[in-house]
């Protein structure tokens, strides 16, 4: 096995200069304009310690997994999807994928947009996990159309595994149309990844039929995070409708600090408010550890690469600020194994410069402290280079042949739209 050592939490970036069509790779020190943007981005985080103040620990290895493939067996590049583990299977829901067949250029539109949202659901079955067809251990398969998400062309969905089902909230339809739907995926039988989606009836939580009151979000929301906590689902942050917003990406939306929860055992179903986050954020992730909900990084109108972390013990007060991450990031790979929460890569936008961060960092929930992480990357039989420098995919923790791993399926190597079908898998230190 060929390997190479990765430098922890460096800020080498692949950067697209908006409006110029040029690509810059490497440290952004070559021009005054880029250096000025670096200074502006750094000014926003002076309240936190410098990167060099964080200790470095060594451990963990990146490898490549099976590539994503669509229903026709083609490699399927995908980003901005939801990734959820249910009954040991990994589900990819929504996201941007290449239009098939590719759109042809015209005089009016010589460079047509090549991507669209999708309702196709892909499933990965870990090695050593007993499963019924169509599951194939160690491979991705496209589920039968009856198991696809009920709305086509979806992306930035918020989804969570909760009490034996997948709950999916909001998201964007088409280019960036707002949605407030709530859909639940129920497996058909034990050991099978196949199932059906349905809206949720308010009165008893069953499948909602035409003419019945179906559960929706209080307001459309996308790109937030959700966790399962006991009988509740907590939905946090994200973007909500707002005209003439200062958002640097989309002036029809703004980030929110809103936190709401749903107790799926209390009927009629009803969304309730929880304490708001200290900082609004979207394109972030969250985990549950030691009886607390932890939210990490993300972006908002102040910064597109937040360092901030917050945690809350439900029904025991509000959010507690935690130590800032060494490097701010949004849309980064994030997942927990044991007491450690790992964060890799991410996206940033500063002035007219966008890019991805090459960063490996780890948070210990027992000590409430961050470290930089020096990892190893295998280059054979498949090259795992770039695992710690992508965005648009949120890590999930899987168990394969009895070993806990972090999977990062798809995503993008550069900012905005640059999806890949590569799947990267991180083997944490200590197995």
Regions found by a protein language model. Name each.
Residues 22, 33-34, 39:
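Cleavable N-terminal signal peptides
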Residues 1-11, 22-27:
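N-terminal secretory signal peptides
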Residues 37-431:
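Kelch-like beta-propeller repeat domains
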């Amino acid at each position: 096995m060929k390997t190479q050592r990765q430098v922890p939490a460096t800020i080498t970036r692949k950067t697209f200069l908006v409006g110029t069509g040029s690509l810059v790779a490497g440290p952004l020190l070559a021009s005054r304009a880029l250096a000025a943007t670096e200074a502006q981005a750094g000014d926003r985080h002076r309240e936190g310690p410098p990167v060099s103040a964080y200790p470095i620990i060594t451990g963990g290895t990146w490898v490549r997994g099976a590539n994503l493939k669509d229903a026709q067996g083609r490699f399927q590049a995908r980003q901005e999807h939801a990734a959820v583990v249910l009954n040991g299977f990994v589900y990819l829901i929504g996201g941007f994928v290449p239009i098939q067949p590719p759109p042809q250029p015209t005089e009016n539109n010589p460079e047509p947009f090549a991507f669209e949202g999708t309702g196709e659901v892909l499933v990965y079955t870990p090695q050593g996990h007993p499963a019924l067809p169509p599951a194939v251990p160690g491979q991705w398969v496209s589920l039968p159309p009856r198991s696809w998400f009920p709305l086509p062309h979806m992306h930035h969905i918020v989804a969570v595994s909760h009490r034996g089902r997948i709950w999916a909230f909001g998201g964007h339809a088409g280019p960036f149309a707002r949605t407030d739907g709530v859909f639940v995926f129920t497996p058909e039988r034990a050991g099978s990844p196949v199932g059906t989606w349905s809206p949720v009836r308010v009165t008893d939580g069953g499948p909602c039929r035409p003419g019945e009151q179906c559960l929706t979000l209080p307001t459309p929301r996308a790109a937030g995070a959700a966790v399962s906590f006991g009988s509740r689902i907590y939905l946090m942050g994200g973007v909500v409708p707002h005209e003439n917003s200062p958002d640097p990406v989309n002036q029809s939306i703004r980030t929110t600090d809103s936190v709401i929860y749903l107790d799926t055992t209390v009927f009629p179903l009803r969304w309730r408010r929880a304490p708001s986050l200290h900082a609004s954020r979207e394109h972030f992730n969250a985990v549950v550890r030691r009886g607390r909900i932890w939210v990490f990084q993300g972006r908002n109108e102040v910064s597109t690469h937040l360092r901030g972390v917050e945690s809350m013990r439900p029904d025991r007060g509000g959010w507690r600020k935690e130590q800032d991450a060494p490097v701010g990031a949004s849309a980064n790979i994030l997942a927990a194994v044991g007491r450690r929460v790992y964060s890799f890569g991410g996206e940033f936008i500063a002035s007219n410069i966008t890019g991805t961060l090459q960063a490996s960092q780890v948070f210990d929930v027992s000590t409430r402290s961050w470290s930089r992480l020096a990892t190893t990357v295998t280059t054979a039989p498949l090259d795992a280079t770039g695992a710690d420098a992508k965005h648009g995919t949120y890590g999930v923790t899987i168990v394969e042949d009895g070993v806990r791993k972090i999977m990062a399926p798809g995503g993008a190597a550069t900012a905005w739209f640059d999806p890949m079908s590569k799947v990267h898998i991180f083997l944490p230190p200590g197995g």
